[in-house]
Amino acid sequence: RLVEWRPGDQIVLERNPNFWKPGLPKVDRLVFKVIKDPAARLAALKAGTIDFTTDIPPSNLRDLEADPNLDAVFRPSFNVGYLALNPSHKPLADKRVRQAIAMAINKKAIVQAFWGRLGVTDGHFTPPSMKAFQSPKVTDYEFNPQKAKALLAQAGYPNGFDLELWYMPVSRPYFPTPKEIAEALAADLSAIGIRVKLQTKDWASYLADRKKSPGFQAYMLGWTGDYGDPQNFYDPHFLGPIADLFDPQGKNLVIPELNELLVKG
């Protein structure tokens, strides 16, 4: 039963003596503490002031496994991270430019550098833990900077173009170190002539402003599933009118053909 709730601080639950099944719950008290900073969560865990936590940055895994007082328990991930491209920014309106960006980013190297063995690349918009819903016909773009350069030239940008790339100001499982990951993305894009300017702002403004007309040119975000159905990943992003991406007018993305497929699915 709930005995205390301090928003942004902690929730305290105590054993309900009137629970319908004798012997349960098996613990007398649970305290859920809000510790936003990953480093602070890890410090609290190592100090013994909390018993367990989640969403520790992958870079701390070796440190965790080396501590005899701690156990690292692995579970399948249930989230995806993505780079959203705004088609109202002229270069990004061309499919070849978007394809070039996909081919210019060395996703496997970035995953290895920032997630280690805790992350994978995937061409689907659902996590690999939902493989039963993933079609083998869907493949990811290859890492091919030369082909990416050729596509940019075909689209009329042989010398590249300027791009503002926004990164999240907070850590999330899908982007545990967003600034550093954004820097890696910028380095890959610079290799094909795209001149990236990194931007960020406070989290509330980031979420609100990313798709307000004209919207961010490109931004990093992700999604952690609420339940085990691909609809929970696809609908919030692509099913109009609730789609949480943008179109050239800064409104929700609405693609009739895609809507029809999602509804049928």
Predicted regions and their residues:
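Second-shell loop/turn segments in exported
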Residues: 31, 86-90, 97-100, 133-141, ...
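Ligand-site clamp/hinge motif
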Residues: 17-63, 182, 195
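Periplasmic-binding protein-like
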Residues: 88, 92-130, 177
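Structural transition elements
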Residues: 121-154, 172-180
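Gly/Pro-rich hinge or "lid" segments in bacterial periplasmic/extracellular proteins
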Residues: 1-25, 29, 37-39, 146, ...
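Extracytoplasmic/peripheral linker and loop segments enriched in polar/acidic and small residues
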Residues: 111, 191-208, 212-214, 235-265
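Ligand-binding "clamshell"
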Residues: 62-74, 213-215, 229-244
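Ligand/substrate-recognition segments at binding pockets and active sites
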Residues: 7, 149, 153-226, 250
